[in-house]
Amino acid sequence: LRELMQARYGGYGVGWIDAGNELNKYKRTIMHSFSGLTEHMVMKRDSYTFANGGIAERYYPMASGASVSLHSKAEYPHVAKWNVARLYCKAPAGLSINMSVDGGTSSFRSLGAASGLQVVETKQSMNNIHYSLSGSGATLFGVALESDNGIIIDNFSMRGSSGTTLSKIPEATLCD
């Protein structure tokens, strides 16, 4: 459906990818690897705190060093590349990020300490991106790989969730 809509109305990218979900390895459109992240999801109530959750009902506290890599499988033309990558996180003590796009030279970004949601945006045509992150107390949510125009479809993996728990996401998180 995404490919057909993007072919007709424009747009690129696979949309939302959870930062550290093991199920992402089964996606037909993206190769995803990560390290240094611990998954908390609404279906595992013993370790999930609603105050920390995001719209996809998952969050990933990171170790002092973590990484996330995303690479298109190029199976479908409109998901083989994207021109905006947005990493969503909370970094109450700040966060240092080294990024590499399409295997090129690394660039460095630093996020200052903030209590709310922060977004690291990279704009250029790409088919892979690698993040190396360091900082204490940071939580990752996911990465949106998309275009600035056309059709963008985000699929949140809600397996097992009826959706009623979405009402427990703090309003401040939704506003961020």
Segments predicted by a language model, with ranges:
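Conserved SGNH/GDSL esterase-like catalytic core that processes O-acyl groups on lipids
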Residues: 1-101, 105-176
